[in-house]
Amino acid sequence: MATPVEPPNGIRTPGKHYYSMWQSLFEIDTKYVPIKPIGRGAYGIVCSSVNRETNEKVAIKKINNAFENRIDALRTLRELKLLRHLRHENVIALKDVMMPIQRRSFKDVYLVYELMDTDLHQIIKSSQTLSNDHCQYFLFQLLRGLKYLHSANILHRDLKPGNLLINANCDLKICDFGLARTSSGKDQFMTEYVVTRWYRAPELLLCCDNYGTSIDVWSVGCIFADVLGRKPVFPGTECLNQLKLIINILGSQREEDIEFIDNPKARKYIKSLPYSPGTPFSRLYPNAHPLAIDLLQRMLVFDPSKRISVMEALQHPYMSPLYDPNTDPPAQVPINLDIDEDLVEETIREMMWEEILHYHPEAAVALLWKLFYELLLVPSRHRP
């Protein structure tokens, strides 16, 4: 349990209470009690709580010094902008973002999500038996959430088992949208690290100038293989080794299957690799359902233009018993995530403040009244 503490300056802000957790101060809205630590990492510290007003169980993520690293600050801003618009059973819901006390100098950001029990990475490495029904249901939900994202014009770009949250009912929700981009974004191409290496599509490993929704499909294929085999299918040690592992399993590619590689040096490297006949997925995963193997090999196709789409995957015989297109509407409107990568800290902070206001309409109204009164007072200061 977190330890209640006094505020650092001795002055208690109305509506806030204070906790110490892993030597970090949490300044939490009083409607959230009790506060229990869950985990910590490079992303920040996470605790569980209950919203007393709604009785909902939530996860509170504190991002400490959110603006210390500009790239990380942009990731947080991007996630805020995106999750405000997304509403889907298989996408994590951002319930609240706590209102900072100081608009122009706040450093920490507190994000409040719906609470989940674990993630797919933890399940894969556990001793928990996974039946075909488990594998099928996890994949179905992942594809269903991804179809929704793609219908909103969004590429996730960082799908991996650790970014798929699971609860005790085996419900799955996609999370961590800090690397997400609109699929038509003009500055999306290889501007930064994209997708954890083991789940990175060949077109990204080969630094192709153009990529699309098929990069997410490749990641889904890698994740599904991990579930079937209970270990990573392509655990590369670095970029070139990653490509070698892919070719070893998929087999050497024909000339027409590498035409998408626009970099001559990259194409030459692929052609220089020793010949591999490939390894059938049915041999790698002998206990998997034959239809699961068929769908897997349609997702893990080297040439992105020949890779199965999310919609096609949902209509595949392995998924069709679960999929009903009539209960799976697309996103209402495409979402634009284009954000200037060169924004300075002050601008990012102000944009984040504006996003936070969407979760606090009462604060937004109070701010409008304040501006209104200030405008009324301006003429009186200049009267003779």
Swiss-Prot record:
Protein family according to the UniProt entry: Belongs to the protein kinase superfamily. CMGC Ser/Thr protein kinase family. MAP kinase subfamily.
Keywords: ATP-binding, Kinase, Nucleotide-binding, Phosphoprotein, Serine/threonine-protein kinase, Transferase
Reactions listed under catalytic activity: L-seryl-[protein] + ATP = O-phospho-L-seryl-[protein] + ADP + H(+); L-threonyl-[protein] + ATP = O-phospho-L-threonyl-[protein] + ADP + H(+)
Domain annotation Protein kinase: ranges: 32-319
UniProt cofactor(s): Mg(2+)
Protein name per its UniProtKB record: Mitogen-activated protein kinase homolog 1
Gene name for this UniProt entry: MPK1
Species name: Petunia hybrida
Post-translational modification Phosphothreonine, affected residues: T191
Tissue specificity note: Expressed in vegetative organs such as leaf, root, or stem. In the reproductive organs, it is found in the ovary, but not in the stamen.
Transmembrane segments: none
Residues annotated as binding ATP: I38, G39, R40, G41, A42, Y43, G44, I45, V46, K61
